[in-house]
Regions:
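Conserved alpha-helix/loop element of class I SAM-dependent methyltransferases that forms part
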Residues: 57-75
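Conserved class I S-adenosyl-L-methionine
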Residues: 176-199
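Class I SAM-dependent methyltransferase Rossmann-like catalytic core
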Residues: 38-60
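A short glycine-rich, Lys/Arg-flanked "PGG" loop and its adjoining helix->strand segment in the class I
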Residues: 159-174
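Class I SAM-dependent methyltransferase SAM/SAH-binding core
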Residues: 79-81, 85-135
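A short acidic, Gly/Pro-enriched loop at the edge of an enzyme's catalytic core
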Residues: 134-146
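A short SAM/SAH-binding and catalytic strip from SAM-dependent methyltransferases
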Residues: 144-157
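Helix-to-beta-strand junctions that scaffold the AdoMet/dcAdoMet cofactor pocket
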Residues: 96-97, 155-156, 169-171
Length: 215
C-alpha cells in the first residue's frame, strides 16, 4: 500500500513536467507521423521520451527489480541497449559503484536526455553510444552483462544484433531480454528462444510471466 501511495505522489509531481513536455514537443509539432509512431510498431519516437519515465512503470518492472534479475555485481561492465531517456539506467549506474554502464540507443535525442538526467544526479560512471542500426564499433569480450527492456521487437536486423551481443559479451556473460504486455513490438518467450537458437547462448532463467518477463 505504501508503494502505491509513493507512486501516486510521484505521478502527481510528474504531471507538471509532462504538460510542459507535450507543449514543447507535441503541440508545436503537427506531424501526424510522430503521433502515429507512438502507438505503432517500430522505434519509439524521442518526442514522447518523457512518457517512458512515468513512475507507474515500477508496477510492471522497477529498476531495482531489474537489477536483481540481472544478478549484477558492483564491478560489472554493463551495456544497456535501447536505453531511451534512462529510466533503468540511473539506478543501474548507481549500483555499479566500481563498474561502468554504457547506454546505447539509435536516437541521439534519447541519449541527450539520458545524459542530462544522469549528469544532474552526479552519475559519472556512464558512457553513451549512438547505434547505427547494424554493427557496434565496440571491442570483443567487453561486457559482463548486456540487457534490453521492450527493445528487441523494434530491431529490424535482430540476428545481426544478437551476433554482436555474443561478440561483445565476456565468456559466461549474460544477455538479458525483458518484454512487457501492451508493447506493440512485444516478442514472446518462444520467439526469443527461436531467435537465439542459432547462437551459443544457454537459457538460464525466466522471471515473471509470459506476458511480462525477463530472460
Amino acid at each position: 500500500m505504501k508503494e502505491i501511495k509513493n507512486i501516486i505522489i510521484k505521478i502527481e509531481r510528474f504531471q507538471s513536467k509532462k504538460l510542459k513536455f507535450f507543449k514543447e514537443n507535441l503541440m508545436e509539432n503537427k506531424k501526424n507521423s510522430v503521433i502515429e509512431r507512438f502507438a505503432k510498431k517500430g522505434v519509439f519516437p524521442y518526442q514522447f521520451a518523457l512518457t517512458l519515465l512515468i513512475p507507474i512503470r515500477n508496477i510492471f518492472l522497477s529498476p531495482q527489480k531489474l537489477i536483481e534479475r540481472l544478478e549484477l555485481k558492483e564491478g560489472d561492465n554493463v551495456l544497456e541497449v535501447g536505453a531511451g531517456p534512462g529510466y533503468f539506467s540511473l539506478k543501474v549506474a548507481k549500483f555499479l559503484k566500481n563498474g561502468r554502464l554504457t547506454l546505447a540507443d539509435i536516437q541521439q535525442e534519447m541519449l541527450d536526455i539520458a545524459k542530462k538526467r544522469l549528469a544532474k544526479r552526479k552519475v559519472s560512471n556512464s558512457e553513451y553510444y549512438l547505434c547505427n542500426g547494424t554493427k557496434f564499433e565496440i571491442e570483443d569480450n567487453k561486457f559482463d552483462v548486456i540487457y534490453m527492456v521492450t527493445v528487441l521487437g523494434e530491431i529490424e536486423n535482430q540476428k545481426e544484433y544478437i551476433g554482436e551481443f555474443y561478440r561483445m559479451l565476456k565468456p559466461n556473460g549474460i544477455l538479458s531480454i525483458s518484454e512487457q504486455g501492451g508493447d506493440p513490438d512485444k516478442m514472446s518467450v518462444e520467439e526469443i528462444e527461436e531467435l537465439l537458437k542459432d547462437f551459443n547462448f544457454e537459457f538460464y532463467k525466466l522471471y515473471g510471466t509470459k506476458n511480462n518477463f525477463t530472460i
